[in-house]
Amino acid sequence: MLTVIPIPAFQDNYIWLLRQDASDKVVIVDPGDAQPVIEYLEREGLSLAAILVTHHHHDHTGGIDALVKRYSPRVIGPDNSAIPAIDEVVGDEDECRVQGRRFEVFAVPGHTLDHIAFYAPGTPGLLFCGDTLFSGGCGRLFEGTAEQMHRSLARLAALPDDTLVFAGHEYTLANLRFAQAAEPDNPARDAHLGECERARQLERPTLPSTIGRERQINPFLRIDQPGLLNALAEQGSVDDDSAAFATLRGWKDRF
C-alpha cells in the first residue's frame, strides 16, 4: 500500500512524501525546502529514493540541491534548465515507475509552460498536480495562456471521480470563498467550505481532494454552469469557454 504524507513548507506549500508499505525508501514531490524533508526523514529513519518535480518555480525546487547532496536520489521532472540535478526528463504521455507504482505524465501548461502532472492509476488513482489544479481553484497564469490552462484542467477533470488530488498549496479556503462569489448557488461547495474551515481550525490539511469533488465545487471546472456564466457575464466576455475561463481567472486575480 502506498501512503502519502504531507510535509508543510513555507507559509502554505505541501511537499508530498510517498512511502510503499514499510519500505525505508521514499519519494517526495516538489521539495521547495530541504530542511523539513531532512527533519522528517531523519526522525523516521527513512532514505530518499526519488524526487518528482512538476515545474521550475523555486518554491517547488529550492530544496533539490541539498537533498541530492545528502541522499543522491533520482530526480524526475520536466525539461527545464532552471530545475537542478534532473536525472530523467519526462514529458507528455511518458511513464515512470517509483515506489512500485506506475506514473503517467501529463503536460499541463498554463501556470508555467513546463508544468507537468504525475498520475498513478489505481483504485483510487493518485494525482500530483503541483500548481495547476488546487482544491476550489487553479494556478495563476505566469507563463501560459487561459486557453492552455483551460485545456490542462479539462484533461485532469476527465480522470476518474475517485482520483485523489494532491495539490502544491493550502489555498482551499481562499479559493472556496471566491467560488461563493462566482457561483453563489452551490450547496455542495458551501458544505465543503464548512468542512474545510473545521479542518483548518484543527490545523489539518484540506487535501487531498478528489476529482469528483472538484467537479462539484471548483468554478474552474464548471465553466458551463448557468449560474457561473451569469456572474461571469458581469465581469467580462463569455463568448466561448476559453473567453469565460479567461474572465474567471482575471476575476480571481483581482478578488
Swiss-Prot record:
GO BP: methylglyoxal catabolic process to D-lactate via S-lactoyl-glutathione
Pathway where this protein functions: Secondary metabolite metabolism; methylglyoxal degradation; (R)-lactate from methylglyoxal: step 2/2
Record's catalysed reaction(s): an S-(2-hydroxyacyl)glutathione + H2O = a 2-hydroxy carboxylate + glutathione + H(+)
EC number: 3.1.2.6
SUPFAM superfamilies assigned to the protein according to its UniProt record, in alphabetical order: Metallo-hydrolase/oxidoreductase (SSF56281)
Cofactor binding note of this UniProt entry: Binds 2 Zn(2+) ions per subunit.
Keywords, alphabetical: Hydrolase, Metal-binding, Zinc
Cofactor: Zn(2+)
Positions of Zn(2+) 2 binding: D59, H60, D131, H169
UniProt-recorded Gene Ontology molecular function terms: hydroxyacylglutathione hydrolase activity; metal ion binding
Binding site for Zn(2+) 1: H55, H57, H111, D131
InterPro entries in the cross-refs: Clx_II_MBL, Glyoxalase_II_hydrolase, HAGH_C, Hydroxyacylglutathione_Hdrlase, Metallo-B-lactamas, RibonucZ/Hydroxyglut_hydro
Pfam families found in the cross-reference section: HAGH_C, Lactamase_B
Functional note: Thiolesterase that catalyzes the hydrolysis of S-D-lactoyl-glutathione to form glutathione and D-lactic acid.
Family affiliation: Belongs to the metallo-beta-lactamase superfamily. Glyoxalase II family.
Assembly description: Monomer.
HAMAP family: Glyoxalase_2
Protein's name in the database: Hydroxyacylglutathione hydrolase
Gene: gloB
